[in-house]
From Swiss-Prot:
This is Tol-Pal system protein TolB. NCBIfam families: propeller_TolB (TIGR02800). The Tol-Pal system is composed of five core proteins: the inner membrane proteins TolA, TolQ and TolR, the periplasmic protein TolB and the outer membrane protein Pal. They form a network linking the inner and outer membranes and the peptidoglycan layer. It comes from Burkholderia pseudomallei (strain K96243). Keywords: Cell cycle, Cell division, Periplasm, Signal. Part of the Tol-Pal system, which plays a role in outer membrane invagination during cell division and is important for maintaining outer membrane integrity. The keyword Amino-acid biosynthesis does not apply. It comes from the Bacteria. SUPFAM superfamilies: TolB, N-terminal domain (SSF52964), Tricorn protease N-terminal domain (SSF69304).
Amino acid sequence: MSLMTKLGFRALVASCLIAAGGAAHAQVNVLITGVGSTQFPIATANFVNEASLPQQVTSVVRGDLARSGKFSNVDAGSTPVPETASVDFGAWKAKGANAFVAGSVNREPNGQYKVNFILYDTVKQQSLGGLSLTTSNDNEGMRKTGHKIADYIYQKLLGVRGVFNTRLSYVQRTGNVYKLLISDSDGQNAIPALTSKEPIISPAWSPSGTKVAYVSFELRKPVVYIHDLPTGRRYVISNQKGNNSAPAWSPDGQTLAVALSLTGNTQIYSVSSTGTGLRRLTRSSSIDTEPFYSPDGKWIYFTSDRGGAPQIYRMPAEGESAGAAQRVTFTGSYNTSPRVSPDGKLLAYISRTGGGFKLYVQDLQSGAANAVTNTTRDESPSFAANGQYILYATQSGGRSVLAAVPSDGSAPPQILSVQGGAIREPSWGPFMQ
């Protein structure tokens, strides 16, 4: 199979091999398949007054912490505990909890709800602070509040910003219908941004988290669009002769790198976020595709078969006219789909290994690379905004699913799937503004 066939149409070919049926954007199921080697035991008591809510905030918090693989939920019992209550640190420590969360939900005169909570360190017997959050009394509002609380806990106890209150984009295929879906980080609250009878591939979040670029085949050829999520407006960014594919945002959100077959072999170009100022960046006789900007905006990583087989290279963001491309991957003979971590230290990519395709992570300073999954049909990696996790597409039980794995490979992947449908092409959104 040629590099163009493998990369340019991988999602289309894969999805056509999957028989799918069932309801549109069905509920996503999350299967926790493993946990980290070290977990922080925490007890989250039921919040006062939350029992009658359409969505209990604490169930979202516990679910987020469990899915992270970094925490173990200690049974806090069924009795609600307000944040104003005095804390018996010894009793909670005796239950096995090194941290404890208490809180309440109260209706405001304007109909909104105030959610208050405090996080306690039971070992040091001290408060780690808390938040007072205002939300609407609906499923979406309460879930978002729960994600914010989990983010607070994650950062206070682990020293790293949490990503529970972020969003995912991915493509679901049900029969001959394709949907570009936007969901919470746990796959819940999925909302279709686009529905089409033609394939949709390569969604990519803007740095602001308000736009998603993607490739649609609705014009009977691949065309790059940008979708403005708050307004629902979408517009064409690249509809050049031949294939238009693989959009990638610059860190400032002003430019996109795209792969175009405008002159024959696919090459990498840049274009403004308004669709103007097309500029060619690579000038090789090979296939150059799958561009991705480094977080500092100085480099573009990309896949090329200029060495005979696909490998990952990088060049100055201004293009090869500003400096020759340099090969980056040397482990394995077939490497594609480069994605750089938000701190610029790690490179995630897909490597053909033993007849399968596995997600690898390479330290960009040392060059050391290791597989981080136990699956063998991996594709489309995407780092979480904090760099701690990688979302990717794979196969599980004969179905197309999404999976999330710690970027250091310290725990098995967690599977996100839908009943009767195939989900692919994931992209993990940035921190919410």
